[in-house]
Amino acid sequence: MPIWVDADACPLPVKEILYRAAHRAQVVTTLVANQGLRVPPSPYIKTQQVEKGFDVADHVIAQQVIPGDLVITGDIPLASWVIDAGGEALNPRGEIYTRETIQARLGMRNFMEELRSAGVQTGGPAPFNAADKQRFANALDKWLLKGKLS
């Protein structure tokens, strides 16, 4: 039950939670990014640097994920691929993507993309805050506990 992290856009507080959790739960956690990353020394924390390019890290993660893996990503298409592969997806704000919710999220993402393409300014997500950090930590702990019980 390894953890994969779409690390290019992952907030630092989320990475720090993941580092502690990887060590505490002894779960291999691989951060995939198109740039070098500094991570604490640990046999459970790995990095994988990929070529620069649109969605390159997403494709690398999607090709390696297997059922039971957890992927940390805010990228809706990647989350959909992960779910289709039998993995689980959690965004950095603590929202767990499920087979039931991912289609609606994809539809909304595509709709917003169409608006932006038409020149409509849609704004962005709210700044990452302490409540997001806590929701993420709680969701990660729940996933780790579920893994230990199975």
Curated annotation (Swiss-Prot):
Disulfide cross-links: none
Family label: Belongs to the UPF0178 family.
Name of the molecule in the record: UPF0178 protein ASA_3749
